[in-house]
Swiss-Prot record:
Its main location: cytoplasm. Catalyzes the NADPH-dependent reduction of N-acetyl-5-glutamyl phosphate to yield N-acetyl-L-glutamate 5-semialdehyde. The gene is argC. Keywords: Amino-acid biosynthesis, Arginine biosynthesis, Cytoplasm, NADP, Oxidoreductase. SUPFAM superfamilies: Glyceraldehyde-3-phosphate dehydrogenase-like, C-terminal domain (SSF55347), NAD(P)-binding Rossmann-fold domains (SSF51735). One of its GO terms (cellular component) is cytoplasm. PROSITE patterns: ARGC. This is N-acetyl-gamma-glutamyl-phosphate reductase. GO terms for biological process: L-arginine biosynthetic process. Belongs to the NAGSA dehydrogenase family. Type 1 subfamily. The keyword S-adenosyl-L-methionine does not apply. Pfam families: Semialdhyde_dh, Semialdhyde_dhC_1.
Amino acid sequence: MDSINNKSIRVAVIGASGYGGIQSIRLLKEHPDFEISFLGGYKTAGLKWNDLCPFLPLENDPTINAVDLSEITDKSDIVLLSLPNGISSQLTPKLIKEKVRVVDLSADYRYRSLEEWKSIYSVESSKHSRKDELLCSQAVYGIPEWNSIEISKAKIVACPGCFPTASLLPLMPFLKQGIIETDGIIIDSKSGTSGGGRVPKEHLLLAESSESVEPYSVVGHRHTSEIEQELSNLSGSNIQIQFTPHLVPMVRGLLSTVYARLRDPCLTAEDCKTVLETVYRSCPSVEIQPVGVYPKTKWVRFTNKALISVQVDQRNGRVILMSAIDNLIKGQAGQAIQSLNLMSGLPTCKGLPLIGYYP
């Protein structure tokens, strides 16, 4: 397997051929401390990796294995799951029982309540029986900038979705400190087509998505409840938001613009920038822009960086927060590697790209 003698932490990747799995393997391949010890899949089992992904060759051209519990537990210290919603929960309880720690890219453990997951992911719930309420309550929501201690001790880390990542990072400092009102929060997000995954979908075809911007799931997008859960837990009150995602004609990148009412309308953009800088001063993956400089998705492509900017409209007392991330890295695989680092006693951003390529 793609190992180097001084790599000491064995990581199995299950669901290796999707976008999340591919990004994870690329980051693990370049990481100085992690060894890719097992590649697993369902539909791709038996295929050679370099045939499936010739653009990302691995040493010794490993075969993607069937998902065999005993082999996974024998060969890994931590398992990174990049499986469709509903499927991760069929494997995770067995891994935890064998004392193997799990980082999960799906939504299966993002909710503290299994019943809430079932109501939001009703289609998946109808296909996959679950009785892992306790694991749902024990899973740590994987925002490393906020939950680093909990992640370091976790048996299972539930990686946030890409929209929640880009929305929560700018919002949480203001909500935590009571600087904004808890009602009337609006989030407008725009994401590239890779956010829809690698499985072919008609609306993601070039002829359908090119030269067009479209809103979708305007009411009831699945990430709405995920964002609300985290904001409510942080504030101690029930928070409802208005969240509208948009599909834009680019492959990768995500931009969220968040609107909230200031409790003190006299606060300036510089005041709000200071709030962000104070909270994230020790977080290499988060960079606060000068007032008047607004983040672009191009600036964060292929990086684990979140660029955040703030402005205040003093006419109406609103703060406007802008956040740009690469949806496949900071919004998915890179954030998972941050959790792997913390679980392994390593610096949070070790082995992760923080400087992009321009243009």
